[in-house]
Regions:
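Short secondary-structure junctions
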Residues: 41, 123-124, 163-168
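Short beta-strand or tight-loop elements
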Residues: 118-120, 161-163, 174
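Beta-rich nucleic-acid/ligand-interaction surfaces
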Residues: 166-184
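Amphipathic interaction/junction segments at domain boundaries or subunit interfaces
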Residues: 47-148, 169
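N-terminal leader/assembly segments
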Residues: 1-71
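Short, internal active-site loops enriched in acidic
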Residues: 38, 139, 172-175
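Short, non-transmembrane amphipathic alpha-helical segments
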Residues: 147-162
Length: 184
């Protein structure tokens, strides 16, 4: 069941949690969880593939882990998101994505986003060969979500064989806008 507060699907969390532990180390991860309220730490640590984990808990985990390892929380989250997305799209998906047109590749975003986040919506506009604009429709989207969507979009394009990918993210009244360009 989806959370009433903004949340991320457990299948994504279980994958990301493994990447986070690999990145910061198990000791740092466990130390970070002890800094959180017990209910939040348990919710994150015990999340399974069918759960929905509130974004606020994920942000708290990122901040606590960053404090433990002496890093910036958003930069650490970016690294974990990039590696997690790269692994997710780099598996069997890579072979399928390479034979997908630019337009078809960009239109996968709303489906992936809708299965990942409990709130918000993504609307791509295919502008032509090698360009697209992605609109995140979520006025109060947390910074973690805004950044992660840009990173995941870049990794999706890279898995599809696109090169020289550039994504410029701007906060907008209704959420965020991502201006994307690439070469095949």
């Amino acid at each position: 069941m989806r959370s009433t507060e903004p949340a991320i699907f457990g299948a994504v969390i279980t994958h990301t949690r493994a990447v986070l532990i690999e990145t910061v180390g198990r000791d740092a991860y466990e130390t970070a969880l002890r800094k959180l309220p017990e209910a939040d730490a348990d919710l994150y640590a015990r999340a399974n593939a069918l759960d929905w984990v509130p974004v606020r808990v994920i942000e708290a985990v990122a901040v606590a882990c960053a404090e433990v390892v002496g890093r910036d929380a958003m930069t650490l989250n970016d690294e974990v998101s990039r590696l997690g997305s790269r692994r997710a799209f780099g598996s069997v998906w890579r072979a399928f994505l390479r034979f997908t047109s630019d337009e078809a590749l960009m239109t996968r975003g709303p489906t992936i986003f809708g299965k990942t986040y409990s709130h918000g919506r993504v609307r791509p506009e295919f502008s032509g060969q090698g360009t697209a604009t992605i609109h995140l429709e979520w006025p109060s989207a947390p910074e973690l979500v805004v950044r992660t969507l840009g990173i995941a979009s870049e990794e999706l394009l890279a898995a599809g064989g696109r090169e020289r990918i550039r994504i410029v993210t701007e906060r907008a009244r209704g959420g965020a806008v991502y201006r994307c360009s690439w070469r095949e």
